[in-house]
Amino acid sequence: ESEQGVNDFNPTQLMWDVHPDRDREWFEKETRNMSRRQIAQELECNFNTSGETVIHPDDIKRIFQNVREPRHRAGFDRNYWIWEEYNSDYTYMLVADVARGDGKDFSVFHIIKLETMEVIAEYQGKPAPDVYGNMLFSAGKEYGNCLLVVENNSVGFAVLDKLKDLEYPNLYYSIKSTHEYVNQLEAEVMTNSVAGFTTSQKTRPLIVAKLEEFIRNKLITIYSSRTSNEFKTFVWNNGRPQAMRSY
């Protein structure tokens, strides 16, 4: 309202470098763990609006420079894309998102090579929960019984039950109250543990912030055109990060 002359306040913008004790070294240290959005709002007087991508356009452009065709397209629907096969010299983790079950979104998993933080395999499709559970079991076995981190939403529990029935040996468990990771062998004899990862109002902003931080700091490499394209439609909507409607 002050910018529009509606009230008697005089708008003033004070950039971070106005302060005499703040130099480029201070700025670099202060912003190391801040998202571009936080930097713009808190230090550059540039307040983001709805519709802006969560990932900065410059970072999205850089991500696309790494996009390449997978070496293999596997699975019953050919939607399991593989860029690199299992290598026993490395450690892997499989992270799985489970579709809601209404047919409007996809079940997706990514396999990450932890030493280099490369996403070396990916699936995106709409299999039934039991089929998806079998796929996760096979993919996890293929990559050395890697840790399976499966989202435990309503349908996710059905997928996790399938993996338990198949006796997969390396499922992600956490403490219900704190979301703290706990080893599977310990978790199976605890009463306050839960299989899978819980995406909640508490954990979702942390997940998004960490994703943005890893991309901005060039800590993760993504080869998939599908994932890269999703960053173009992952936007801020009234302060909440979410996919654009119809995407």
Kindly give the residue locations of the regions a language model identified.
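Signature of the SF2 helicase/ATPase Hel1-core->accessory helical subdomain module
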Residues: 1-18
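RNase H-like, metal-dependent nuclease domains and their acidic two-metal-ion catalytic environment used
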Residues: 7-8, 24-185, 201, 205-209, ...
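N-terminal cationic and glycine-rich segments that engage phosphates or anionic surfaces
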Residues: 21
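Intrinsically disordered, low-complexity, charge-dense segments enriched in Lys/Arg
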Residues: 184-187, 194
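Structured lumen-facing ectodomains of secretory-pathway proteins
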Residues: 194-195, 214
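A charged helix-plus-loop insertion that forms the helical arch/lid used to bind
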Residues: 196, 200
